[in-house]
A protein has these predicted regions:
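Acidic, mature catalytic/reactive cores of soluble proteins
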Residues: 1-207
Length: 207
């Protein structure tokens, strides 16, 4: 319920927040902002309306396009700051301090590296490494040490994951809790991301 005398004030407040839409680019910017959620000082990207929450993989895949491509580097940094808390909580076996779901998916740390790579394209490698080098090194050390519960580096250099009992890739449809497409083994996109993560982290550290 709301007091009728407050309705006009609330309406004016919402109108003031409304973005002007005068061309197609502004429409895209407006659409990008619709996925932006802020709670308790943390910044999230919602995976979709009305029922999805902030999911780690979706957040990382979408982050560059929803921020960097429209000139909002600071918003990217805010999103990444929130994500980094979830990633570090997971890697250190702590209860998550932020509301990001599916942080346990095997490709999430690899997408994080790719996401930071997109940021580096708009700033210098030195600046990117100063801001995210520690996080990148923590992620790579975590994976190489075999600490991830479902992302293992085998002797052939490829990463292996098991998806027989639980959907672990973007093909995540299930029936009775079981994956319809139980993708397991040397999953192609996981290994593409893994190769990219190795090459990029070494390149960035070398700069």
């Amino acid at each position: 319920e709301i007091r009728p005398t407050l309705m006009k004030k609330q309406m004016d407040k919402e109108v003031d927040k409304h973005e002007g839409i005068g061309n197609f680019y502004q429409c895209l910017v407006h659409a990008a902002h619709q996925f932006k959620i802020e709670e308790n000082g943390e910044h999230y990207i919602i995976a979709g309306w009305p029922w999805f929450k902030c999911r780690a993989r979706d957040m990382l895949v979408a982050m560059p396009g929803l921020t960097l491509n429209i000139g909002e580097n600071k918003l990217f940094e805010s999103y990444m700051e929130t994500f980094a808390k979830a990633m570090r909580d997971f890697m250190n076996n702590r209860k998550l301090s932020v509301n990001i779901y599916e942080i346990d998916k095997p490709d999430v740390p690899l997408w994080a590296t790719w996401c930071i790579q997109q940021y580096a394209k708009l700033v210098s490698g030195k600046e990117c490494y100063a801001k995210y080098g520690t996080l990148l090194n923590e992620i790579m050390s975590y994976v190489l040490a075999g600490k991830h519960p479902n992302l293992f580096v085998h002797d052939n250099g490829l990463v292996y994951s098991s998806g027989h009992e639980k959907a672990i890739t973007w093909m995540n449809s299930t029936i009775d809790g079981k994956p319809i497409v139980p993708r397991s083994g040397y999953i192609v996109e996981f290994n593409a991301l893994w190769y990219n993560a190795i090459c990029y982290t070494l390149k960035l550290a070398g700069q």
